């Protein structure tokens, strides 16, 4: 099943290039604040699944071209992200430590945006702002101290995720938490849609140039161990997002670009890149030159 959030917080089931509105059956109020409708659906999915399937069969079909797709989980309890979790990316960044010893960091939930939004680049002279192609794990069941052997019991589904990053030496959380710096979408593919989570292929293009391509088989810390590590410190809740890390090929974005990310058996989304309103930021006052390691 592919579950989308659209048109101001409504819930839909995607079948092919059509969407079926199941908001009423899901028990979601699109006007609710905070916007936790999808979190409620995820938490109650076992009870709701049959009714959602039936509603999708009877609900009028809307063309995906005629709706505004939004980030699937607008108000997660947290966004967990793993740094340098692919060896080729660690090499290009000259990183001496990897996700297996660094653990995770957090991104601000306010950095989320969806497939119908634009990535807004702050105007920071002397800095590059890079794309990072990733997969989002969507947690479906609360848990703490989850053993790797049981980790997939807690995975609700998967989505495409872009981790937009200002290059520099400042605190990673701030460099990755500007508004629109975490596009997620275009929907959630439930776990049963993924034949082999150990070999999920993803790729990214900027304009027509393919810049990144990898599989989860190349991860340093695999998906079960990501969940084990994260839950050793923090309780995981339905709707929490875990970003799996980026492979090699990161590079700069500029206003006017388009970024396309595709994850097999999940989906594909394309976002435009624009310049955000200029605001002085003293933290990024010094230039930083990004140098890719050579081999």
Where are these regions (language model features)?
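N-terminal non-catalytic cap/leader segment that marks the start of a structured domain
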Residues: 1-98, 195, 280-295
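Residues embedded in well-ordered beta-strands
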Residues: 11, 134-138, 159, 203
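Residue-level recognition of short, solvent-exposed, well-ordered loop/turn junctions
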Residues: 74, 81, 114, 130, ...
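Structural signature of FAD isoalloxazine-binding scaffolds in flavoprotein oxidoreductases
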Residues: 97-115, 131, 260-265
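Active-site glycine-rich loop that binds ribose-phosphate moieties when present
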Residues: 104, 112-125, 138-146
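N-terminal accessory regions of nucleic-acid-interacting proteins
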Residues: 144-158
């Amino acid at each position: 099943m592919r579950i989308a959030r659209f048109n101001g917080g409504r819930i839909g089931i995607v079948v092919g290039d059509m969407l079926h509105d199941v908001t009423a059956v899901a028990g979601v109020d699109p006007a609710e604040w905070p916007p936790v409708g999808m979190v409620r659906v995820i938490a109650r999915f076992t009870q709701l699944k049959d009714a959602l399937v039936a509603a999708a069969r009877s609900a009028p079909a809307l063309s995906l071209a005629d709706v505004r797709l939004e980030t699937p989980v607008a108000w997660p309890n947290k966004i967990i992200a793993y740094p340098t979790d692919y060896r080729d990316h660690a090499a290009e960044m000259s990183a001496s430590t990897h996700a297996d010893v660094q653990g995770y960091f957090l991104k601000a939930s306010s950095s989320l945006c969806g497939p119908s939004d634009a990535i807004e680049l702050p105007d920071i002279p002397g800095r590059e702002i890079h794309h990072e192609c990733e997969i989002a794990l969507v947690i479906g069941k609360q848990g703490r101290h989850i053993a790797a052997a049981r980790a997939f019991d807690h995975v609700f589904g998967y989505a495409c995720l872009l981790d937009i990053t200002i290059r520099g030496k400042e605190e990673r959380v701030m460099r990755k938490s500007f508004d629109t710096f975490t596009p997620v979408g275009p929907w959630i593919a439930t776990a049963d849609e993924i034949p082999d989570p150990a070999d999920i292929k993803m790729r990214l293009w900027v304009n027509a140039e393919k810049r990144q391509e990898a599989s989860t088989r190349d991860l340093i810390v695999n998906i079960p161990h990501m969940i084990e590590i994260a839950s050793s410190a923090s309780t995981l809740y339905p709707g929490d997002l875990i970003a799996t890390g980026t492979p090699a090929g990161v590079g700069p974005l500029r206003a006017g670009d388009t970024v396309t990310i595709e994850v097999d058996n999940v989906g594909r989304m394309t976002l435009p890149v624009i310049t955000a309103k200029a605001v002085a930021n003293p933290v990024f006052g010094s230039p930083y030159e990004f140098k890719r390691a050579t081999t």
